[in-house]
UniProtKB/Swiss-Prot annotation:
Disulfide bonds: none annotated. This is Trigger factor. It comes from the Bacteria. The keyword RNA-binding does not apply. Its main location: cytoplasm. NCBIfam families: tig. It catalyses: [protein]-peptidylproline (omega=180) = [protein]-peptidylproline (omega=0). It comes from Desulforudis audaxviator (strain MP104C).
Amino acid sequence: MKASAEKIDKNRVELQVEVEPERLDEVLNQAYRKLVRKANIPGFRPGKAPRPVFERFYGKQSLYEEAMEQLIPRAYLEAVADTGIQPVSQPEVDVVQLEEGKPVILKIQVDVKPEVVLGEYKNLKVERQVAEVSDSEVDEELEKLRNRYAKLVTIEEGTVEMGDIITIDYEGTINGEPFAGGSATDRSVEVGKGFVAKDFDAHLVGMSTGETREIPLSIPEDFPNKEVAGKEALITVTVKEIKRKELADLDDEFAKDVSEHDTLEALRAETRKKLENAAEKKIEYVMRNALISEAVAGAEVEVPASMVDARLETMMEEVLRPVIEQGMTKEDFFKLTNQTEESMRADIRPRAEESLKKELVIDRIAEVEGLEATEEEVDAELAKMAEFYRLEADRLREILEQRNDLDSIRTAIKRDKAVDLLVANAEIVGQESTEAEK
């Protein structure tokens, strides 16, 4: 087989492929053997009709169609390997010549991985904040811990208070008509958390189990259903159960109950350390992303529309899959969020293109710098993943190999190394902050 590649646009090539007549004869025979098994030809058992008889009965075209379904994908993959192109879209195939006894001639157009012209990616200047944690942040985290380990006690007698966990049914109407997102049954609500709006929870205080109350509500402007946002509604609420938190005292006994520490002081120190580590990770992420953006800004790269389209589909699926899994249709989701599928695509598309630019630039830096993922590094990453998924590392490797996903791990390692290189060669300006970035 002969194959050549010609650049016809910035990120698009045309493959010219010539397949030997003998190979065409071979796939035509394979097509005949496959189709004749299902053929119903008078006077012959299935699979026994000679090829000339089959062709007279079904026509040669049926053989050619079946043969090309086998030949084109194989020829395309071989041409890609022979020419060394990196396709990023589905191929568009034009059969130029298809005659028995003559070479098959194909013209195949496909988008390819775009060329990246790097700008300056060393000595970039970036600002990095200093992670600091205030006493009030530590206190807030300990209070969350108290609430997390609080006992919930059912209140048989008594009324709703701020901080209670109540189960309610509610139905909202506007001018007597129900609206999307305005009703639910057995909804658990923590009173005071601003279930719908901050002033709404105040109307729940004082209600008793079994009581129904009509509560007027000005629907917030940021309500998901934009058709009713800002309008006046009437919410009919029935309280079905009241539970109240019993908080433990914040002392050494509490520290022993919720941690491995014997004293509140030790628990407080550990809490501060965790908050500092989280702040450091966030600041590190922001700094690394800023460096990537700087490197992209200095580079020249044009992402093919086909690549953006594919990434856009992936990002759309990531948004919609959880919605559908929860039983909501796409149509209801778009109505609830006051958008259309087209407007959502338009919003996401720039992010899809930007994410691809970042990957292409970082991949090019890794290539220029000769960065690779060693097998030891791949094994270490597999060990982390295996621990997370509670699998044996060898079993995880087997699964990833079956899915052809091991290369994605190698790519991720190389990209991390490329960003590490940006950081190592950057001019990092520290900026004091009184509190950790939130």
